[in-house]
A protein has these predicted regions:
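N-terminal leader/signal peptides at the extreme start of proteins
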Residues: 1-13
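Aliphatic-rich helix starts adjacent to a transmembrane/signal segment
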Residues: 12, 16-57
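Conserved functional hotspots that engage anionic ligands or polymers and/or phospholipid headgroups
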Residues: 15-18, 49-53, 63-190
Length: 190
């Protein structure tokens, strides 16, 4: 019944209890490690979900900026066309000058209002990255940055370039124009 180990006499009756305690401890450690892995997996999955949501919300901000820019282009066309038509009522033989008035007023109206129309101070946050908004060869390039901060402090940033062109006076004066022809999206990035 008794076992002699290194000069110490042991009784077999307590060894089963010690073995049972060791097995239970190993099962608990294994269970805790599986639980820890599951919690970490959930945290990573939640972060990925929040990250994707933040990215899509930032893209939504750019889409909203696109719609606001289309509205601004349409408004600029209408106001500039009205100014050119008013000029033609007074000077009916100055078609070239009316076209020039249309183009100049269109560019002025776009440059004066695009910052207020696009920039937002809310989530998603939209900002214009280039400081100088100048038409070059009847093209205005507007660099936009959109960021979204998720409630779990997950932030994503994306950007795009809006290229706004000046429409032809004859095309818009006939009333058959599509605003989307005067804005292009380029350099979409994340």
């Amino acid at each position: 019944d008794d076992i002699l180990i290194i000069g110490v006499v042991m009784n077999n009756k307590g060894s089963v209890l010690i073995l049972l305690v060791i097995v239970i401890a190993l099962v608990i450690v294994l269970g805790l490690s599986v639980l820890n892995s599951a919690v970490n997996y959930y945290a990573i999955k939640k972060f990925n979900t929040d990250s994707k949501e933040s990215f899509y919300m930032a893209e939504t901000g750019l889409n909203e900026a696109y719609v606001m820019t289309c509205d601004l282009i349409n408004e600029s066309i209408e106001e500039s066309l009205q100014m050119a038509d008013d000029y033609l009522l007074v000077n009916p033989h100055s078609q070239a000058e009316a076209e020039n008035i249309f183009v100049v007023n269109y560019m002025i109206h776009i440059r004066a209002n695009i910052g207020d129309r696009i920039k937002t101070g809310e989530n998603p946050f939209i900002e214009i990255r280039n400081e100088d908004l100048i038409f070059v060869d009847d093209i205005l390039s507007v660099m936009l940055k959109a960021s979204y901060m998720h409630e779990n402090n997950v932030s994503k940033v994306t950007g795009a370039e809006f290229v706004i062109s000046v429409p032809g006076y004859n095309e818009v004066s006939s009333g058959t124009y599509d605003v989307r022809n005067y804005i292009k999206l380029q350099n979409w990035n994340s």
